[in-house]
């Protein structure tokens, strides 16, 4: 790699990179990937600035060669590549002369035309992930961020790319060339995998002072010091009689171990109450898409352009009216909000050039729906600590809800195949070792089974919505930005397709902490009549907005089209996890892999091919009241994926608690089935811990009902 860097980059860049690494005590000969990354970043910064000038009139111009005497000023000041002291001197001088706010971290460039500092990023990972790491690190709205990737993708603050198309294409081509050159020398894989996120310095510290005293005070009885306790724990032998061990640990414990027999466990008690309601951030089986095939319109790929194009494919719009009101909401406001979206989309079309983003007018209906000015005023603690009856708000206990059949239908639907493919196979380099060949084979088989699965559509929809919402929350904090809900797929014939599910309008989003909430209103198309299962749609106001002609076996039929509108909220940390929903594919692939491994170790050879290609064999999928359900290996893949996706879509404290506590009971039952004669103490306490998580969450209630089916069949 070191030789490659010295051949591939200009000697001046190599020298600057070496200097920078030495300044931080790093050796270019050892940390060769870092050496290459620094050179690449420097080169991109220089290319960004090259040929860009400001003429006498203050206009930005591009001059590749010409009159050396022309009165031209460089458009960009290059800060990257200077030693730290000099770089800060330049930054301070710019701030003093222009009045621009001083950044906390050294930026890479200053743009005299845009009057802003620019942070350039070059990433081997996904641009949006790297963009967010940068944004989180510099935490400044004033510094403009522009990220390039080696795959030709880019991302910039507010989608403002500063440079013209051609200059950016030069940079992308150069990055692509570097990647090709590395790949041809077998260096790319190691370089790609070596990228870490933005690093923060963490201090290591010994436990001293107050913390040490607290540690000593909180030891169990009969221990004099922390070291003494540590030595005991390290030497604790975990085998032998449980009662003896417990009494050895503490005099207060006297646990009677009860044998756990087939007749011991009882079913979990599910709550009574009204049926549970839908609480996902977007519609699942009830969603309706307006789609365009082979999109090639101007601005294709810009969400707003795509959305308008999709909206134009539907001709059955009609005067909207409320068909299922929201019990607690002001329903006319939801109606007005939809009308406002239609009107503002119409306004955009009447403009000469469609903007890349659309901020909605702050009307009274949107202010109400987005909870503007509804947060209680924050008061400094110093001003109110003397108030005698200062107390926290009383919050109501959540109302218990019973299991409703719709959540099982949602799950069944998520396991089904659609007629489109939602994921592409990543380009991964040639397999080198035999183990890589097996891994690629497993991945390809697995991808073939799940690429058309509806759960995979939910993953891509979730990734898109969360990325777009987090982006808008950072880039347009005060604006009510209109965000189309879009996904992309390929048809059976391999044609590209862009789908619009509806729109989100984001509220104010000054998100300082990970858990700070941004409110949004979602408006989603559907053909589902909400009056069939009104309990499912408790949190929604549903409008009828049009009539759609559908082709059926008996010819064309007209069906009413509905719009499901609700106020919702999310946080930075939830959006971050939402953006990483692709991990669900990995989790379910690993579960399948452990099944293949078990089979392979019995047969003492790799069973991947037989596992996926033996269509006659069936596998256990899950429990139902009818008994153990079985299905093909593809069905197993899709069921595992759907479970993982629903764990992400319906993530909640109730699910965390239920999963952790019910697992303990599951292990005891498994031990009984394996004739290990398990014993338990305080089984009642375990049931209590499980059942306190069964309150109102549809996914948790469904899992509890599956668990009961499992208990019934496991203990026959």
Curated annotation (Swiss-Prot):
Residue stretches in coiled coil: none
Keyword annotations of the record: Cap snatching, Endonuclease, Eukaryotic host gene expression shutoff by virus, Eukaryotic host transcription shutoff by virus, Host cytoplasm, Host gene expression shutoff by virus, Host nucleus, Host-virus interaction, Hydrolase, Inhibition of host RNA polymerase II by virus, Manganese, Metal-binding, Nuclease, Phosphoprotein
One cellular-component annotation, GO: host cell cytoplasm
GO BP, one annotated term: symbiont-mediated suppression of host mRNA transcription via inhibition of RNA polymerase II activity
Motif Nuclear localization signal 1 (NLS1) boundaries: 124-139
InterPro entries in alphabetical order: INFV_PA (IPR037534), PA/PA-X (IPR001009), PA/PA-X_sf (IPR038372)
Post-translational modification note: Phosphorylated on serines and threonines by host kinases, including human casein kinase II.
EC numbers: 3.1.-.-
Subcellular location: Host cytoplasm; Host nucleus
Signal peptide location: none
Sequence positions that bind Mn(2+) 2: 80, 108
Primary localization class, coarse: host cell
Residues that hold Mn(2+) 1 according to the record: 41, 108, 119-120
Purpose of the protein: Plays an essential role in viral RNA transcription and replication by forming the heterotrimeric polymerase complex together with PB1 and PB2 subunits. The complex transcribes viral mRNAs by using a unique mechanism called cap-snatching. It consists in the hijacking and cleavage of host capped pre-mRNAs. These short capped RNAs are then used as primers for viral mRNAs. The PB2 subunit is responsible for the binding of the 5' cap of cellular pre-mRNAs which are subsequently cleaved after 10-13 nucleotides by the PA subunit that carries the endonuclease activity.
Assembly notes: Influenza RNA polymerase is composed of three subunits: PB1, PB2 and PA. Interacts (via C-terminus) with PB1 (via N-terminus).
Annotated protein name in UniProt: Polymerase acidic protein
Source organism of the structure: Influenza A virus (strain A/Turkey/Ontario/6118/1968 H8N4)
